């Protein structure tokens, strides 16, 4: 499965647009580690806990996006976009939304 943030694939003409596919992934952040995340963020360091949660959520959202495109018998997903949200005021979770257009290639 080809995944691209662009609307076209160079050298691979699109034969058919199959529709929009979307997915989401929610990852909890360990509250004990979250304390250290805030401490590190305050002093400008990188938070491995948050980066790991974001990476895992993005990977899960991508896998689900590909599964939904496969259900449509797509060869690729174009125009892929990821949105990240931390809906909890306390920062206890991260949500990644993924959307794109499933296509069949010539």
From Swiss-Prot:
Domain of life per record: Bacteria
Pfam families, sorted: YbjQ_1
Cross-referenced InterPro entries: UPF0145_dom_sf, UPF0145_YbjQ-like
Annotated HAMAP family: UPF0145
Similarity-based family: Belongs to the UPF0145 family.
The protein's name in its UniProt record: UPF0145 protein PputGB1_2909
